[in-house]
């Protein structure tokens, strides 16, 4: 009887481990890791299909915002240099730079930090 119980437990554990991860394979296409076919079926930050998996390859550029709102030419150049941030599956956003830019240029949000 104990052997049958152990076999049942082992089978349930195996099935649980083999279950698809809803974060990666669910209907929410904003999670990186979403399965894709390459026909624009990734969205949000995870907007590029690479080998049937959505990847994060967003380029966030705030030049338009800064050119309309910066007070002088030097501020525009400085802001543009600091606020062009590339995000991909390996890059991490520097929170010190983000905080500096938000405080200096009055932007509410630049980007969320990619998951580790």
Curated annotation (Swiss-Prot):
Location(s), subcellular: Secreted
Disulfide bridge partners, by residue number: 32-46, 36-49, 42-54
Keyword annotations from UniProtKB, A to Z: Disulfide bond, Knottin, Secreted, Signal
Source organism superkingdom: Eukaryota
Keyword NAD: no
Entry's Gene Ontology cellular component terms: extracellular region
Domain notes from UniProt: The presence of a 'disulfide through disulfide knot' structurally defines this protein as a knottin.
Family: Belongs to the UPF0499 family.
Name used for this protein in its record: UPF0499 protein ATEG_06693
Source organism of this protein record: Aspergillus terreus (strain NIH 2624 / FGSC A1156)
Organism taxonomic ancestry: Eukaryota, Fungi, Dikarya, Ascomycota, Pezizomycotina
């Amino acid at each position: 009887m104990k052997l049958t119980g152990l076999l049942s437990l082992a089978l349930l554990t195996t099935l649980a481990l083999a279950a698809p991860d809803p974060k990666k394979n669910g209907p929410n296409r904003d999670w990186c890791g979403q399965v894709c076919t390459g026909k624009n079926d990734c969205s949000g930050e995870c907007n590029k299909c690479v080998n049937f998996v959505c990847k994060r390859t967003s380029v966030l550029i705030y030049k338009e915002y800064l050119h309309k709102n910066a007070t002088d030419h030097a501020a525009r150049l400085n802001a543009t240099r600091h606020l062009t941030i590339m995000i991909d599956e390996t890059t991490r956003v520097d929170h010190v730079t983000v905080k500096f830019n938000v405080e200096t240029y009055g932007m509410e949000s630049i980007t969320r930090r990619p998951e580790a």
